A protein has these predicted regions:
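Beta-propeller domains with acidic blade repeats across secreted/periplasmic ectodomains
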Residues: 9-169
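Bacterial N-terminal signal peptides
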Residues: 1-7
Length: 169
């Protein structure tokens, strides 16, 4: 089991009694260890593995309070370059999103739920950075009840959750 530590929203909780380093309890035949945490991964809101088994994380500084001066949401590759089982670096894969709420790989395409858009990005030249950004659909509502949870199914269709905000009604 892999664990990512972080929060999808920037809240100032006054109750600090919970141990931020505590891991979930699991049966004896399992082990849980932290793979990546802050500051390496900040405000993670979604994650997906590509066909090579690499972890991609959508980070959301825009979540809940988007402002023009706040950096846009991004997708980063989270890397374990020394093979010790813990992430030690990231590489920016795609930038400039408003509110990443879901990631799903399909072939070379990374599909991104990015309120109010559904976007796909591609790395065309193999440098591990997205070169092509395609807005597949827009007007999918706000980030609260908008597009979330992307999953490609065995039937070849992309499934997603969408709440009661405007678009696709």
């Amino acid at each position: 089991m892999m664990a990512l530590a972080g929060s999808c929203f920037a809240a100032d909780f006054t109750d600090k009694s919970a141990d931020p380093n505590a891991m979930p309890e699991v049966p004896a035949e399992f082990e849980v260890q932290l793979f990546a945490g802050e500051p390496l991964v900040r405000q993670p809101c979604s994650m997906a593995f590509d066909a090579k088994g690499r972890l991609f994380v959508g980070m959301g500084p825009q979540y809940r309070s988007p402002k023009p001066e706040t950096p846009g949401d991004s997708v980063v590759m989270v890397l374990d370059t020394d093979g010790d089982g813990q992430a030690d670096s990231t590489k920016v894969f795609a930038i400039g999103f408003n509110a990443i709420q879901g990631l799903a790989w399909h072939g070379r395409d990374l599909w991104i739920a990015n309120a109010p858009d559904l976007t796909l990005v591609r790395d065309l030249d193999g440098d591990d950075q997205a070169d092509q950004y395609v807005r597949v659909y827009t007007d999918l509502g706000n980030l609260e009840h908008g597009l979330h949870g992307l999953n490609w199914a065995p039937d070849g269709k992309l499934y997603m959750s969408k709440g009661n905000s405007k678009g696709l009604n």
